[in-house]
């Protein structure tokens, strides 16, 4: 498997380190010695899952609500172990205490939240070869196929549809662009932002962060949109900038300091961000990984709490991929 480093919140052993101590520097969680490649890491409130390129899923952390395993007596998965799935997996997302997968046959399954088995979510998808992807945050999930976005879960802020309601148990059509395919959905705790294949924001709903106005952003293109629970971040690779919207009570807004090297990757966790830059050193490149935001569990490095500015957490000769969880940070090499 790819070599995976993790740090941050670990009270339910969600970092896969074999202990339950929070860590403030990158720790090797997966040694990277069996050939499998990590495609994606998704995290809930206290559990983590990794999807590999062969369609397998492994997980660790909290199982008190059936997030990972069917054994109700198993309250905690101490180390990475396989998650039994109905079929090979092509995508995965996590809510606070739930796990949702899309299998190779285009079916959507959910477990957790008190359910200890995968049960099928009947999303009205077309039986064609269009990509199907799932995204989740806190108490919401959405599934994307072509021009359509379907969602279920909390609707207390009208993030799925109007009028507001406590929860939608069955998937509903959230949005249909009608023409251009949806690329992805960026989700916060009470809101979502839908982005098309041109990097344009086509829809936003729910309790949007302070300062974000949909009409002001819809004319822009080639954006990468990322969300924390309470903020929105727009990465413009051409301008080498990250623009943030929200209150920033714990330094979640991107620090407006000059970057001397190009940004090559950005990810967000619950209330922190992870940034990768490419640095030229002679004839070779090296890559720096920084964090910013709320680092209460060491997920932004040794300087815990709300630290202004970018915190350097690692330097690598190969380009890393980065993922953010609930006060956890992941680096994949």
From Swiss-Prot:
Coiled coil: none annotated. One of its GO terms (molecular function) is ubiquitin protein ligase activity. InterPro entries: Ran_GTPase-activating (IPR051553), RCC1/BLIP-II (IPR009091), Reg_chr_condens (IPR000408). One of its GO terms (cellular component) is cytoplasm. Changing residue 157 to D: Does not affect interaction with KTI11. The keyword tRNA processing applies. Its main location: cytoplasm. RCC1 repeats lie at residues 1-53, 55-104, 146-197, 286-333. Keywords: Cytoplasm, Repeat, tRNA processing. It is found in: Cytoplasm. This is Protein KTI13. The gene is ATS1. GO terms for biological process: protein histidyl modification to diphthamide; protein ubiquitination; tRNA wobble uridine modification; ubiquitin-dependent protein catabolic process. It comes from the Eukaryota. Together with KTI11; associates with the elongator complex and is required for tRNA Wobble base modifications mediated by the elongator complex. Association with the elongator complex is mediated via interaction with KTI11. The elongator complex is required for multiple tRNA modifications, including mcm5U (5-methoxycarbonylmethyl uridine), mcm5s 2U (5-methoxycarbonylmethyl-2-thiouridine), and ncm5U (5-carbamoylmethyl uridine). Together with KTI11; also required for diphthamide biosynthesis; diphthamide is a post-translational modification of histidine which occurs in elongation factor 2. Transmembrane segments: none annotated. PROSITE patterns: RCC1_2, RCC1_3.
